[in-house]
Amino acid sequence: METATLIAIFISGLLVSFTGYALYTAFGQPSQQLRDPFEEHGD
């Protein structure tokens, strides 16, 4: 394969991995530990 193709595949893989990790952190098991500033601020 050409170098440009390998670089494009590598960058695409990094982007997909980062997006998957961000979604897992936001909506998966670790989201139970996130604090909600709107619930903490009771009027």
UniProtKB/Swiss-Prot annotation:
InterPro entries: PSII_PsbN. The keyword Transmembrane applies. It comes from the Eukaryota. Its main location: plastid. Keywords: Chloroplast, Membrane, Plastid, Thylakoid, Transmembrane, Transmembrane helix. May play a role in photosystem I and II biogenesis. This is Protein PsbN. It comes from Suaeda aralocaspica.
